[in-house]
């Protein structure tokens, strides 16, 4: 898949990406990132803080080809990911989830026959 505007990193801009479903391990890693940001104890978030929480989860589901996974921190994504590309990535994750759900439903129908 390809980003519209890309993510700047170093002296380049990166466009190719892959997404994956959030696993339990990924959720735990995202929660650790939220804690590292000092946001795990807060009850009310500013818009930027809420986006950092969302990006902690997104970072566990996203690979930008050419950028090391450990560089894709919530703060890095907040500072460098364009809104259009954020929407594109979240839609790709939603499509992947739907694909997996649909595959499970079609398998259930076959088994029921």
Regions found by a protein language model. Give the residues of each.
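Short, surface-exposed, charged amphipathic helix/loop patches that serve as local interaction elements
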Residues: 1-113
């Amino acid at each position: 898949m390809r980003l519209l505007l890309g993510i700047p990193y170093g002296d380049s801009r990166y466009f190719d990406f892959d997404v994956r479903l959030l696993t339990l391990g990924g959720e735990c890693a995202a929660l650790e990132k939220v804690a590292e940001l000092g946001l795990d104890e807060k009850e009310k978030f500013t818009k930027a803080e809420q986006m950092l929480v969302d990006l902690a989860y997104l970072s566990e589901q996203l690979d930008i080809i050419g950028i090391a996974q450990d560089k894709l921190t919530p703060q890095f994504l907040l500072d460098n990911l364009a809104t259009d590309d954020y929407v594109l990535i979240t839609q790709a994750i939603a499509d992947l989830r739907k694909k997996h759900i649909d595959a499970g439903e079609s398998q259930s129908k076959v088994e029921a026959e």
